């Protein structure tokens, strides 16, 4: 039976923090705090406090979203107990406590802040405006904001999304291939990343893959890192074979909601431009590409060394935006 007390189940605590956010006590801001700054970058669900829960669960906790102001969880910086030596003399102790009785819920560590977060590219741009660590991988949003946010008089962005709110705060609107490459190399050499995720929104004319390809090709050629792409589904499915050939390892399609009525209501732009079925067909098509690649690889076993670059197709949903049974059905379909 699953442990239902968040004090003893860090996985459940992680989910609850996603849903309720975290309030920050003034003690958190004392001089000497280490860790990654809270940045408003173009992560569609918002950007928050990068932290590590017990069990080495890396997470990003909402702290600036409005709902976090009502969170039952508070973050404190406290002295180490006399019977508990600090693991590092310079390391602060952070704990999550429940509002009201101040019951201890969990200790927590801040994700380490890499030295390159304070540097600029050779062009003079802050490296954090080009890319940022999301847990243990690098996230890059190379182009302009999703055009759903730019429509007038009425925007058609997904109703849960914060992309348009974050643009220009901690994220640059224009990033050259060279700037992205410099940040990728810094993150690889100093933060030990092995994966880079490239993300775009919707652009008129389905130009998102055209925009990404120069970045993908250069980063793969120069670093050999694993690369992921998250965009709307392209009408020409053969484009995904081209991505595979240039070294992309993962494609992801965020259809968000399985329930068709809720999809139309919550994601009006995606419904108008693509429709749920097109998202599902792209997931299915790219998954079949992966199965075909595995069969070809297996058929060559025993004939000498072979090169295998993984290929993964993902469909992504957000739990809580539809009835649980619909999300479960989506998970069963995806997996």
Where are these regions (language model features)?
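N-terminal [4Fe-4S]-dependent radical SAM core
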Residues: 60-157, 164-173
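Short acidic, gly/pro-rich beta-turn/loop elements at beta-sheet edges
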Residues: 148-150, 208, 239, 263, ...
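Short Lys/Arg-enriched alpha/beta "domain-start" segment
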Residues: 1-81
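Short, electropositive alpha-helical surface patch
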Residues: 212-217, 249-252, 304-310, 322-335
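Alpha-helix termini
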Residues: 150, 186-190, 287-290
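Core AdoMet radical
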Residues: 162-182, 187-282, 296, 314
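Conserved strand-turn element in the central/C-terminal portion of the radical SAM core barrel
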Residues: 205, 226, 230, 234, ...
């Amino acid at each position: 039976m699953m442990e239902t007390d968040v004090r003893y189940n860090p996985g459940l605590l992680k989910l609850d923090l996603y849903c309720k956010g975290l309030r920050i006590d003034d003690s958190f801001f004392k001089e000497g705090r280490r860790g990654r700054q809270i940045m408003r970058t173009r992560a569609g669900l918002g950007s928050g406090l990068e932290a590590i829960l017990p069990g080495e669960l890396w997470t990003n906790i909402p702290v600036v979203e409005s709902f976090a102001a009502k969170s039952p969880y508070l973050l404190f910086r406290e002295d180490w107990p006399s019977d508990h030596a600090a693991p590092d003399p310079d390391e602060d102790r952070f704990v999550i406590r429940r509002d009201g009785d101040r019951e201890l819920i969990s200790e927590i560590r801040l994700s380490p802040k890499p030295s390159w977060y304070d540097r600029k590219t050779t062009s003079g741009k802050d490296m954090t405006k080009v890319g940022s660590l999301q847990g243990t991988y690098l996230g890059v949003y190379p182009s302009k904001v999703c055009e759903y946010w730019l429509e007038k008089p009425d925007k058609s962005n997904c109703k849960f999304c914060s992309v348009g709110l974050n643009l220009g705060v901690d994220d640059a609107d224009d990033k050259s291939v060279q700037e992205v490459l410099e940040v990728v190399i810094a993150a690889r050499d100093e933060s030990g990343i092995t994966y880079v995720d490239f993300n775009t929104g919707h652009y008129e004319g389905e130009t998102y893959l055209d925009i990404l390809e120069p970045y993908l090709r250069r980063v793969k050629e120069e670093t050999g890192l694993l690369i992921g792409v998250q965009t709307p589904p392209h009408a020409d499915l053969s484009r995904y074979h081209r991505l595979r050939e240039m070294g992309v390892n993962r494609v992801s399609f965020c259809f968000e909601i399985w329930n068709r009525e809720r999809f139309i209501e919550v994601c009006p732009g995606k419904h108008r431009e693509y429709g749920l079925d097109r998202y599902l067909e792209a997931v299915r098509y790219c998954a079949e590409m992966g199965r075909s690649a595995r069969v070809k690889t297996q058929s060559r076993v025993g004939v000498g060394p072979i090169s295998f670059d993984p290929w993964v197709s993902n469909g992504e949903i957000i739990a809580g935006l539809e009835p649980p049974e619909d999300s479960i059905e989506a998970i069963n379909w995806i997996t």
